[in-house]
Amino acid sequence: MTLDKGQKFSAKHGPNAQADPIIKDKVNKHAAQGKLPCAVAFKIADELEVSPAEIGKTADLLDLRLSKCQLGLFGYQPAKKAVKARAPENRQLEDAIRKALNDGKLACSDAWDIAGRFKVPKMAVSGACESLNIKIKPCQLGAF
């Protein structure tokens, strides 16, 4: 769901959505300047044994902006995006990306899995997707 200009992130979840108090407290402790970095969100999810989506939802309900996507897709300054298009390192990597596509898109979780399987940085996978004109969606945190 995209937001209209000036709309708060919490609007994505409806007026009755509530944040879990334990998650809310942990997210608030780690947020700085209205932002929560992707890596920190995943660390919190791991510590609390909840899904990354729960952390993303809580960040939304607190109207925090997610930053520094580990795939380099959003949250960087000044360009917003850190990833650069880069040809896949090998044919097997490209094949794995193409095999994991769903409706022409690669899920963020699949990008992470592929990076782990091939022992390459996450941005190597997202860079390959950029060069292949493949969108990465959905985000595990719910950013897109």
PLM region descriptions:
Residues 1-144:
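Long, charge-rich, low-complexity intrinsically disordered regions
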